[in-house]
UniProtKB/Swiss-Prot annotation:
Highest taxon of source: Bacteria
Location of this chain's protein in the cell: Cytoplasm
Protein name (record): Ribosomal RNA small subunit methyltransferase G
Job of this protein: Specifically methylates the N7 position of a guanine in 16S rRNA.
EC primary class: transferase
GO cellular component: cytosol
Annotated EC: 2.1.1.-
Keyword Methyltransferase among record annotations: yes
InterPro entries with a match to the protein in the record: rRNA_ssu_MeTfrase_G (IPR003682), SAM-dependent_MTases_sf (IPR029063)
Stretch list, region Disordered: 218-237
Upper classification of the organism: Bacteria, Bacillati, Bacillota, Bacilli, Lactobacillales
Gene, per the UniProt record: rsmG
CDD domains: AdoMet_MTases
Organism for this UniProt entry: Streptococcus pneumoniae (strain ATCC 700669 / Spain 23F-1)
Keywords: Cytoplasm, Methyltransferase, rRNA processing, S-adenosyl-L-methionine, Transferase
Length: 237
């Protein structure tokens, strides 16, 4: 997808980009490729592929009408090179975005990126999702948690639901269909007092299938969740 195609598709969906936003995406691409040579950020470095499979793919929650352009608190778990939250932040500057990532080198990249793109209202923390979720400054503080290709729902739910306010939503972006995954996650979702609200399916402009599973938090998460770092993966609920 050429940058012009990206701009046009957004304009068609009533999301026209300003020159500044176009420049932000362009600089994002340049820094991604430059830093990818120092630290492994992505296997996708071709410009048209980045615009399609990283930028366009990341803004799906906005295109699907799931996220408003308001000062809401969004947490992105395991964002890697900033996907999906930072492309959404460029598009919707009002969003207040926090990223937690377990690799310090990636956090360094994200801090530089935010500086270069002049993004305000972005916060980066180095560490494990399981640890931060037990910190009262993070637990039950967010309207949305996003995770793109991070883990199966059975594991992902324990890593993310504790961060949500009651009524808040987890948006899990996936490239493969999730019905059997949701069956496996049924017990975990019940224990975490959360419920699958929707499982949206759509296609990228190149026809690649994509899914967003929307999970709503119904009640406060029991204090024992999430368990210690590594446990959700080792012994899923």
């Amino acid at each position: 997808m050429k940058p012009e195609t990206f701009y046009n598709l957004l304009a068609e969906q009533n999301l026209p980009l300003s020159d500044q936003q176009k420049e932000q995406f362009e600089r994002y691409f340049e820094l991604l490729v430059e830093w990818n040579e120092k630290i492994n950020l992505t296997a996708i470095t071709d410009k048209e592929e980045v615009y399609l499979k990283h930028f366009y793919d990341s803004i799906a929650p906005i295109l699907q009408g799931l996220i408003p352009n308001e000062t809401i608190k969004l947490l992105d778990i395991g964002a890697g090179a900033g996907f999906p939250s930072l492309p959404m932040k460029i598009l919707y500057p009002e969003l207040d975005v926090t990223i937690i990532d377990s690799l310090n080198k990636r956090i360094n990249f994200l801090q530089l990126l935010a500086q270069e793109l002049d993004l305000n209202g972005v916060h980066f923390y180095h560490g494990r999702a399981e640890d931060f979720a037990q910190d009262k400054n993070f637990r039950a503080q967010y309207d949305f948690v996003t995770a793109r290709a991070v883990a199966r729902m059975q594991v992902l739910s324990e890593l993310t639901i504790p961060y949500l306010k009651v009524g808040g939503k987890l948006l899990a972006l996936k490239a493969s269909n999730a019905p059997e995954e949701l069956l496996e996650a049924k017990n975990a979702l019940n224990l975490l007092f959360s419920k699958v609200e929707d499982n949206l399916s759509y296609a990228l402009p190149n026809r690649d299938p994509r899914y967003i599973t929307v999970v709503e938090k119904k009640k406060e998460t029991p204090n024992k969740y999430p368990r210690k770092a590594g446990m959700p993966n080792k012994r899923p609920l």
